[in-house]
């Protein structure tokens, strides 16, 4: 089985796979870690520096870079026609990116064609993706709230869960009328304690570093 990268256009929803659709073979995959945004201030009369990186409550991250190298055996004329097809779909476009090595997650980023080349037999293309810091779980997480104390586990990324409830509900002393409430409940990394006097459904998108 050939390892593939799947690209899904954010704008159109059209999906293309590196081998099945483009006919190129993945030979190298680099997934960079997002760099923490470290902010320090030197204060006169103080040893070291003052670290304000978590001034807003939690550490933030820069974008991360994904880089993929693909190769194929083509005649030069056929190869440049293929490069044109790949570039038309990917270059400068924002994509959901699914890697073979992490089947439960996807990345979101803008793709660029870094380079392409060919010799008498071998064509090569390098695609870089400037991606958001977190990778996202493919499946949306659902949690059924019950009367009493609920423990909702969340991954690394802080999220705001949507709440759907058929009747009025109070969660951690806040009252929500019947209906759908978008981005209603803040969930941080780990176990979140929610005290409810009714029932409802939480849905949220989990993300990991």
Where are these regions (language model features)?
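Extracellular/virion structural assembly segments
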Residues: 1-209
């Amino acid at each position: 089985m050939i390892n593939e990268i799947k690209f899904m256009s954010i704008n159109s929803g059209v999906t293309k796979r590196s081998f099945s659709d483009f006919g190129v073979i993945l030979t190298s995959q680099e997934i960079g870690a997002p760099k923490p945004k470290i902010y320090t201030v030197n204060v006169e009369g103080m040893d070291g520096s003052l670290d304000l990186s978590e001034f807003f409550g939690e550490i933030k991250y820069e974008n991360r870079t994904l880089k993929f190298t693909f190769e194929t055996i083509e005649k030069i004329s056929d190869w440049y026609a293929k490069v044109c097809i790949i570039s038309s779909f990917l270059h400068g476009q924002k994509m959901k990116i699914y890697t073979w090595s992490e089947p439960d997650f996807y990345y979101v980023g803008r793709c660029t064609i870094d380079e392409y080349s060919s010799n008498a037999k071998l064509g090569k293309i390098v695609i870089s993706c400037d991606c958001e810091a977190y990778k996202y779980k493919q499946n949306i997480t659902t949690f059924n709230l019950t009367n009493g104390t609920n423990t909702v586990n969340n991954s690394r990324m802080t999220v705001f869960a949507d709440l759907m409830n058929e009747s009025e509900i109070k969660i951690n002393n806040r009252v929500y009328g019947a209906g759908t409430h978008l981005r209603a409940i803040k969930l941080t990394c780990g176990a979140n304690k929610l005290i409810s006097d009714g029932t409802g459904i939480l849905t949220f998108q989990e993300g990991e570093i």
